[in-house]
């Protein structure tokens, strides 16, 4: 189950929802059909990829998906195995989410970054045409050190 921590004095899950982020826990090997059909249109529901994200090498923690970015698509991703860490930009500061097997991440337009803590297998789905990728655009936000845990 996703472990979420963030700036004190706010309802972090409510703030995540306001910026387009939601997590649910659904043990199994894929996101629940009800979630997929709620978020993606019929022609977008196919699995785009199954990937294993490896922890970054020392000094590369802020490169690629480890850089603050916004994806051009709406994402519905399922974690099959492993642990990883995400951070999301909220108006009150960054919040940290540690994710593991069974977590479903739904993101639409939120600024975030991702770091696998161990090899982590993902089932990737997102909006857009069949040939579309995530359309990641780095935001240039300062790459502060990653927290040790959520």
Where are these regions (language model features)?
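A short, N-terminal "cap"/entry segment at the start of jelly-roll beta-barrel domains
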Residues: 1-68
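Long, positively charged binding patches that form subdomain-scale interaction surfaces
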Residues: 54-61, 71, 78-80, 88
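Residue-level marker of regulatory loop/turn positions in helix-turn-helix DNA-binding domains and
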Residues: 68-71, 116
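Extracellular structured ligand-interaction cores
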Residues: 73, 83, 111
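A short beta-strand-loop-beta hairpin characteristic of the jelly-roll/cupin
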Residues: 76-101
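General beta-strand recognition
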Residues: 85-87, 113, 123
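Conserved metal-binding segment of the jelly-roll/cupin
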Residues: 99-119, 127-128
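Double-stranded beta-helix
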Residues: 117-150
């Amino acid at each position: 189950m996703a472990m979420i921590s963030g700036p004190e004095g706010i309802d972090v899950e409510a703030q995540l929802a306001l910026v387009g982020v939601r997590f649910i826990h659904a043990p199994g090997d894929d996101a629940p059909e009800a979630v997929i059909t709620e978020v993606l249109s019929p022609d977008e529901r196919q699995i785009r990829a199954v990937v294993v994200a490896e922890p970054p090498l020392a000094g590369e923690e802020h490169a690629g998906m480890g850089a603050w970015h916004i994806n051009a698509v709406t994402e519905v991703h399922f974690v099959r195995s492993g642990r990883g860490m995400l951070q999301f930009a909220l108006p009150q500061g960054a919040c940290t989410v540690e994710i593991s097997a069974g977590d479903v991440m739904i993101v639409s337009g939120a600024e975030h970054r991702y770091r696998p803590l161990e090899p982590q297998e993902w089932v990737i789905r997102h909006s857009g045409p069949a040939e579309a990728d995530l359309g990641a655009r780095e935001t240039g936000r300062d790459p502060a050190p990653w927290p040790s845990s959520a």
